[in-house]
Amino acid sequence: MAEILSELSSREPIFHRPEFGTTRTEFERMTAEDFWEVGASGRIYSRQFVLDSLEERFSAPHRDTWVTKDFRCQKLAEDVYLLTYTLIQDEVRVTRRATIWQKTSDSWKIDYHQGTVVED
């Protein structure tokens, strides 16, 4: 399990690791066909919406200062894992994140992602 935790935590925060992708095609490969997300706002986002947003985000340079910590990994089913962690954005906003990852024959795919704002 330690190896899987290391592999998956290196990919988080998802969609913000240039080494794993910056183009729509790369993000399509990274996400399951039925991927969906619940944002920190509580809104539900479709795969299409997320892909459109990522395409816009990576069209211009950006400088996010994000820190991830407190990673945990739990096996949900054969080749399916829940990864949870804390994300600190620009030293101000703290969210708890959860991503469901599925191991495929040649890579990892994201089935689901959720962010929840931590209130003081």
Please identify what each model-predicted range represents.
Residues A2-R29, D34-D120:
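A beta-strand edge to alpha-helix "cap/lid" segment located at domain peripheries
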